[in-house]
Amino acid sequence: MIKRKHLGLKTASLAVVAFLHIPILIVFLYAFTTESSSFQFPPPSLTTHWFSVAWNNPDVRSALSLSMRVAFTATAIALILGTLAAAAVWRTRFFGKSAVSFVIILPIALPGIITGIALRSAITLGHVPFSFWTIVISHGTFAVAIAYNNVIARMRRTSGSLLEASMDLGANGWQTFRHVLLPQIRPAMIAGGMLAFAMSFDEIIVTTFTAGNQQTLPIWIFSSLVRPRQRPVTNVVALFVVALTFIPIVLATKLTRNTEGT
């Protein structure tokens, strides 16, 4: 009976994995097809021609550059603000601390379309022109929450006696932070930064409301779906996006596991 249960769980797990990843594998497969507009299964033959076409496409390179700059900038801002907010919530006592923590994390739970509409309304009411910074600010709403969530979780597992011992030995606040607290939270900061970068790089819903006429890589992919002869190139770009976001997520997961074990 127990063996049957285990077999059923394994079968269900494999079915879920297949349901989630087979569509991605199909996209990867058709990035190498020799066909330019239609899809046959299996592909008549395989080629890497579309990779050079994608790389030489000025729109793709422009969108990639914008996505990279936005992701790096949003991640840097998120790490600074998220870490400072986590330190303030962790070390100080004030009325409404739980409410502040909830408000910081809230953007993760909100649907992207709600955040996008709210930000677009604020931008329009403020007569702010759409620019690189409107995208960065919109991505920062959830990137800060990701960084904060990782850092505050690690801080709560850090013994306050370490900081007290450092201060008793004559270290000032900066020395205590640099030599005692920072080594403790560094893995969480790196993991939070990687997750924030991955989320920012492939974000499309919020970006659609705050980018104006600018095209990030996910927006370029979405707009290219209506062009049949762009499909192999679109698949190549999608493959690149998946690879670029998959690596930071895997590394962040490993860092988080290592941190939990210490």
Regions found by a protein language model. Name each.
Residues M1-H6, F72-I104, I117, S121, ...:
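Transmembrane-helix boundary motif in ABC transporter permease subunits
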Residues M1-P58, S62-S65, R69, T256-T262:
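N-terminal, non-cleaved signal-anchor transmembrane helix
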Residues I2-K5, S38, T48-V60, T207-T256:
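Interhelical loop and adjacent transmembrane-helix boundary motif
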Residues I2-T11, I152-L163, M167, G173-V180, ...:
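C-terminal transmembrane helix and the adjacent membrane-cytosol boundary/short C-terminal tail
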Residues T11-A12, V17-I24, L106, G140-T141, ...:
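Transmembrane alpha-helices
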Residues I22-L25, L29, I80-L84, I117, ...:
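Membrane-embedded alpha-helices of multi-pass transport/permease systems
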Residues Y30-S38, A147, M189-F222:
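Non-cytoplasmic
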Residues F39-P42, T48, K97, I113-A143, ...:
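Membrane-interfacial helix termini and adjacent extracytoplasmic/periplasmic loops
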